[in-house]
């Protein structure tokens, strides 16, 4: 895929595009040395148009209850605006509004799309005040901070062992259930975690990354 500025495209009946502009360029910059993301006008894809108030969602799925709107698919009723419920219903419909033009990965929400873009740009705005380590997501920073606080919120109900990270906790749970998600193509052997599979694969490839001097 050709490298270029990251952009956003809507995967639906109309396409919306974002373009990246530098500071003080085209009169759209903020002057703070940062790039901006500018929303372009919607472009019709030629598909059948829908009413703006429905946004592609059947009104039968929207139920007004008091001051909130309830989703008939999953029962959530935490939406105080019809537009928020419509956006939520796209999850059930499989619609992913935000697509990365760099790698093609798509997301339901902008809040997930923006941190993903930082993988390509290398931006890591979330910094740990304890050790200075930086992250591209605030959630990653919060998980990292447990190293300093000693917090281990995930406890195994089988053996009582506690963990700071959910991913490590899930891998530990597999030792009790016997579930193994990662398999070797060469021998058909399976492993609890991807790192174990990687080490095993090096046996077949002959790779020896750690050389003794």
From Swiss-Prot:
It is found in: Nucleus. Keywords: DNA-binding, Metal-binding, Nucleus, Repeat, Transcription, Transcription regulation, Zinc, Zinc-finger. A zinc finger (C2H2-type) spans 69-92, 98-120, 126-148, 154-176, 182-204. GO terms for molecular function: DNA-binding transcription factor activity, RNA polymerase II-specific; RNA polymerase II cis-regulatory region sequence-specific DNA binding; zinc ion binding. GO terms for cellular component: nucleus. InterPro entries: Znf_C2H2_sf (IPR036236), Znf_C2H2_type (IPR013087). It comes from the Eukaryota. Belongs to the krueppel C2H2-type zinc-finger protein family. May be involved in transcriptional regulation. This is Zinc finger protein 80. It comes from Chlorocebus aethiops.
